[in-house]
């Protein structure tokens, strides 16, 4: 089944949105298979934002993501990558629709509450950066037969 990586960023953790965000994805019917509160190191941040290394805002990205704890998660379900992107809303909170996470809670592009993988390939790469294989739990949820 398809998996995606989501991360409540330091601003979302500090503003106490972890529970709200987890609840939204659970209510949608997705299955949480890995989660941890963690401090991102500069090394992990560099791997995570590798495609932005040469961009002028790279240092700010690393500084922000390492400024406080994050809540890293792996979710699975049919179409979870695209659906999660839609649930998060556009990157710029002022462009994000009401009802989306960023539309409801985001303040600025830099402090937009949540990160989510933008493709299956990105999800695989990001999951491998933040989680060891043994940290992911494969289990059956009885409600899946009512969803899929």
UniProtKB/Swiss-Prot annotation:
Gene Ontology CC annotation, any one: cytoplasm
Modified residue annotations for Phosphoserine: 122
The modified positions for Phosphothreonine read 91
Gene giving rise to this polypeptide: ndk
| GO molecular function list | ATP binding; metal ion binding; nucleoside diphosphate kinase activity
| Listed SMART domains | NDK
Similarity comment: family membership: Belongs to the NDK family.
Instruction: Give the protein's recorded name.
Output: Nucleoside diphosphate kinase
The biological processes this protein is annotated with in GO are: CTP biosynthetic process; GTP biosynthetic process; UTP biosynthetic process
The catalytic activity, as recorded, is: a 2'-deoxyribonucleoside 5'-diphosphate + ATP = a 2'-deoxyribonucleoside 5'-triphosphate + ADP; a ribonucleoside 5'-diphosphate + ATP = a ribonucleoside 5'-triphosphate + ADP
The subunit field of the Swiss-Prot or TrEMBL record says: Homotetramer.
Q: Which cofactor does it need?
A: Mg(2+)
């Amino acid at each position: 089944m398809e998996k995606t990586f989501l991360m409540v960023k330091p601003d979302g953790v500090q503003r106490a949105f972890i529970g709200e965000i987890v609840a939204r994805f659970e209510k949608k019917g997705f299955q949480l298979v890995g989660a941890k509160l963690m401090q991102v190191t500069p090394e992990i941040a560099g791997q995570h934002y590798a495609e932005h290394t040469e961009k002028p805002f790279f240092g700010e990205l690393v500084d922000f993501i390492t400024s406080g704890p994050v809540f890293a998660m792996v979710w699975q379900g049919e179409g979870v990558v695209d659906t999660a992107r839609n649930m998060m809303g556009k990157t710029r909170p002022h462009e994000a629709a009401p009802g989306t996470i960023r539309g409801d809670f985001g303040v600025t592009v830099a402090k937009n509450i949540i990160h989510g993988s933008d493709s299956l390939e990105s999800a695989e790469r990001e999951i491998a950066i933040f989680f060891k294989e043994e940290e992911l739990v494969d289990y059956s949820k009885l409600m899946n037969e009512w969803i899929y």
